[in-house]
Amino acid sequence: MSDGRTALFPGTFDPFTNGHLDLTRRAASLFGRVIVAVAPSPGKGTLFSVEERVALIQSATRSMKRVEVVAFSDLVVDCARRLGAQVMIRGLRAVSDFEYEFQMALMNRRLSPSVEVVFMMPSQEYSYLNSTLVKEVARLGGDVHGLVPQIVETQLKARYGAASAGARKSAGAAQTAGASSARKPSAKAARKSSAPSSRKRR
């Protein structure tokens, strides 16, 4: 049963995984309104644009009535205040996440004491998942089925499939050019082979 408060779930979500989806669904059962807030993260260099990520998350959470998806570029606490959120959701996958998240929670509390940080652990089946790992598996042609929502899986395959096809095409063109160059004699070699021999026949 929800308590009526608005919860903000911020992140880069590049891409949105089933771990993120699990936390979103569970947060929606606890709070009256959940806002998934997508950050641009220009320092990281993302696979999908902010607009693409927002659209993918909207599609993945379409059946969740209490969930909204927005983009933001200001401080997360400012975003929370602007959208009327009283709670900020943060996921903890493992002990290794705790130190960073604890520091961030203390900083956010200093900046905005009225916004309460709530830590949530994902379901055990998603406890190892993170976006970087999913992208690496997809980039190398691995199966990401069950790791991300279906719409995200489709877009990952399209994105990395196109990149792989382009790389194979470039490699093939380079090999063809190399083979052609190897078969074609140089101008200097051609002149040398056509010049009369100065040696006398014995």
Segments from the language model and where they lie:
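Nucleotidyltransferase catalytic core that binds NTPs
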Residues: 1-202
